[in-house]
Design a protein with these regions (language model features):
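Active-site microenvironments of metalloenzymes and redox enzymes
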Residues: 48-54, 66-168, 209-216, 286-305
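Surface-exposed recognition segments
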Residues: 54-65, 180-182, 203-305
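Short, well-ordered junction/capping motifs at the entry into regular secondary structure
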Residues: 171-200, 228-230
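Positively charged n-region of N-terminal signal peptides that target proteins for export
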Residues: 1-5
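Mature N-terminal segment immediately following signal peptide/propeptide cleavage
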Residues: 34-47
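Structural recognition of the beta-strand scaffold that forms the well-ordered cores
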Residues: 39-40, 123-124, 146-148, 164, ...
Length: 305
């Protein structure tokens, strides 16, 4: 059953940020004591893909893609932020992902003892659960938050084209060789050139796109986004604390797999949580262009069905 929430009174007063003066990094407050930073990602063109000898076949061909400006959260969503949504008693808990609901409780600790304080990144959620959090943010703030597209994520990771060598990556992220078998607090490592933390390593990050091995060959050149299909595979990016440093590339694409939820004993398996996906989290983006309420709601309906 759909749950209808009242819209914030300032919703109709929201204006579109269009000028250089307005397009700046800001702090999004979601509670008197909780906020997160949204970093400006400028419009531009870049080469999507990789010509590295370590690249997989789905990282080719190199293509020039043009993107509109957007904001991206400077770090992965943390438990401090997620728990405001998860504990929002105005929302019903439901096994189905419909309307606006909050995630059902985990039947076991899906951090597997790695840590759950406010600065740890939230982990083990499905892509749809991450999108529901984005919808909750929209209802709470009036701003259109969503998961990044693959192209947006890769563009932000490359940050103007300055690639980090595997040897230098230990200063920027946690991976198999330096993570001690667990994920860590956000922002413990250096940010990339655009001020984004943990883009490579710590947790893999959901994008909004359906995984297509031919993505780089088939997507359009401007602001590409794929239409959702089956639950599997969807695309994650960035690598995690479990991945070797050689897998931490901005162009590396990670298709989700039913094995990420293999040990879930529930019938049917949870649509919110991934018992074996302890390595995946997410961060949010906000397009500069604020669409109408009707278009935004249709967007959420499409990607949450």
């Amino acid at each position: 059953m759909r749950h209808h929430c009242s819209w914030p009174p300032f919703f109709l007063l929201i204006t579109t940020f269009t000028t250089g003066q307005d397009f700046r990094t800001y702090d999004q407050k979601i509670d008197p004591a909780v906020s997160f930073k949204m970093v400006t990602i400028p419009a531009g063109k870049f080469l999507i893909g990789s010509k590295s000898i370590m690249a997989d076949s789905d990282e080719a061909p190199l293509r020039e893609i043009e993107l509109s400006p957007f904001w991206m959260s400077e770090h992965e969503v943390t438990f401090e932020e997620w728990d405001l949504y998860f504990n929002d008693m105005s929302l019903p808990q439901s096994k189905t992902i419909d309307g606006i609901t909050r995630a059902t409780p985990q039947y076991i600790d899906l951090t597997w003892g790695m840590g759950r304080d406010g600065k740890h990144p939230v982990n083990s959620m499905s892509q749809q659960a991450a999108m529901m959090y984005c919808k909750w943010l929209y209802i709470k703030t009036g701003f259109f938050y969503r998961l990044p597209t693959e192209a947006e994520w890769e563009y932000a990771c490359k940050a103007g084209g300055n690639m980090v060598t595997p040897e230098a990556l230990k200063a920027y992220g946690y991976f198999k060789e330096n993570a001690d078998g667990k994920f860590h607090h956000v922002k413990e490592k250096k940010p990339n050139a655009w001020g984004l933390y943990d883009m490579l390593g710590n947790l893999r990050e959901w994008t909004i796109d359906q995984y297509d091995p031919a993505y780089y060959s088939t997507v359009k050149n401007n602001d590409p986004i794929t239409t959702p299909g089956p639950r599997y595979p969807r695309t994650a990016r960035g690598g995690s604390y479990l991945d070797p440093v050689t897998e931490l590339r901005c162009s590396n694409r990670i298709p989700s797999d039913p094995k990420w939820n293999q040990r879930d004993p529930q019938i049917p398996k949870s649509r919110w949580w991934l018992t074996d996906g302890m390595f995946v989290g997410f961060r949010v983006v906000r397009p500069v262009k604020q669409h109408s309420r009707e278009k935004i709601e249709k967007f959420y309906d499409l990607y949450l069905k």
